[in-house]
């Protein structure tokens, strides 16, 4: 299935940024496929989006070091399809395509279920 992602690409003279159509086959291996509902912009994402080599070394790249969303596919016993989850840190948005996309695929140990009383949008405030 296709989805949109913010992509930073290295060119001969700098970096280009655009919204592109991606395929789930473009995503890395992982136990959870997540439909991203929210992600926040922070300092590290800004550095990554401008091509800072101290933050991102592999291109093309999708920034976004955090994301919250709904599990679409799970091969891990602790998560079910439909679970609301939060992902912050690890390699997300650094070496692994990040939250500035409509889909991410990650190892299950990067995710936590959204606690009762907290919404996916409030996590990023």
Located regions from the model:
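A structural motif shared across PLP-dependent enzymes of the aminotransferase-like
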Residues: 93-108
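Short glycine/threonine/proline-enriched tight-turn/helix- or strand-capping micro-motif at secondary-structure
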Residues: 13-23, 52
């Amino acid at each position: 299935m296709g989805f949109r992602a913010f992509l930073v690409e290295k060119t001969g003279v700098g970096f280009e940024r655009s919204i592109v159509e991606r395929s789930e086959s473009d995503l890395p291996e992982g136990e959870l496929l997540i439909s991203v509902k929210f992600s926040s912009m922070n300092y590290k994402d800004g550095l990554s989006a401008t091509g800072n080599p101290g933050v991102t070394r592999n291109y093309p790249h999708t920034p976004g070091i955090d994301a919250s969303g709904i599990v679409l596919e799970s091969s891990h016993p602790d998560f079910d399809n439909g679970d609301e989850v939060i992902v912050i840190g690890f390699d997300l948005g650094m070496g692994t395509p990040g939250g500035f996309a409509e889909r991410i695929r990650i190892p299950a140990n990067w995710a936590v279920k959204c606690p009762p009383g907290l919404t996916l949008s409030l996590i990023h405030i």
